[in-house]
Amino acid sequence: MTSALIGYTGFVGSNLDRQMRFTARYNSANISEIRGKTYDLIVCAGIRAEKWLANKSPERDWARIRDLLENIKKVNAGRFIHVSTIDVYENSGEGDENTPINPDHCQPYGRHRYRAEILLRELFKDLIILRLPALFGPGLKKNFIFDLLNPVPRVIFPEKFWEILDKVGAADKKLLKSCYRMDAQFNLIPGLHKEALSTLHKILDQVGFTSLNFTHHKSAFQYYPLRRLKSDLEIVLNHNIQLQNLVTEPLPSDELAREVFELEFLNITDKPPLQYNLKSIHHRLWNNQEGYVYSKAQILDWLADFRANYRI
């Protein structure tokens, strides 16, 4: 069987690439080469998952998706598996695969990815869509789990950076300036020693600005372990499921911090806490009776293992 993976250098794609063998692999650098090809199976994890950037620059976000779809239009596939997101739902607090979606009520991030789903349905007769929640696994670069592991912000906007400098002493000011590089915003220089990161964390914690400041302690997210993607995909394929929410039992942020990181997390944000609680009509295939593919207890166990083996 011939197979292709689109997006093999991305977060989801790189994890799937470790778990499965593909005849060909594509990313943004060589995606045009897929035109005119025929594969028995194509897995597409090629749409970027930077929600804040998509909502900030929606035209640019859709242009990237459109360019990818223009290449995909030129390929033949016996079966096409598309990795999407649960953010296509207008209400993250309820719903399942049967819930109607009005993309006009979604933010650009969800609206564009739902639009991509619709276009792919028109292109491929045998299309499987996987809608994923927040993720964790090798290569993690964002979300609350990443922030707990990396409390020093990777990006600080100029106004906030100058505000922080006004609150610290000369030595701390010098360290901050040496560790962040100015572009459109201040970006943390990669490859800093653990000692420098630890000192930065103490400085920023004292002025009340770490990566953890962006999450309300009562926000509850659904986290999916990418280590399970191959086995869960096999369940979907074996049961000929066309649309699958790979959603897990919601995990409150304060509980995650306490149970996995031994941290008492009490942060309050200006915005109300987010509540993700989407379900799947296929949950019994995972021997779960609550509407999820995995329970909170299972996720906590996998998160503890992920933290123990995490490397910056």
Regions found by a protein language model. Give the residues of each.
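N-terminal Rossmann NAD(P)H-binding glycine-rich loop of SDR-like oxidoreductase domains
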Residues: M1-F22
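Short glycine-/acidic-enriched loop or helix-start segments at secondary-structure transitions
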Residues: N15-L16, W52-A54, E90-E94, G139-K141, ...
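A short, Lys/Arg-enriched amphipathic alpha-helix followed by its capping loop at the start of a domain
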Residues: N15-T23, R35, L256-E259
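A short, well-structured beta->alpha microelement
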Residues: R21-T38, L266-D270
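NAD(P)H-binding glycine-rich loop region in Rossmannoid oxidoreductase-like domains
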Residues: S32-G78, H82-E97
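Glycine-/Pro-rich loop/turn segments that contact NAD(P) or position catalytic residues
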Residues: I86-I145
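NAD(P)-dependent short-chain dehydrogenase/reductase
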Residues: D126-I129, P133-F221, R228
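Mid/C-terminal beta-alpha module of Rossmann-like enzyme folds, strongest
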Residues: F209-S211, H216, Y223-L274, S280-R284, ...
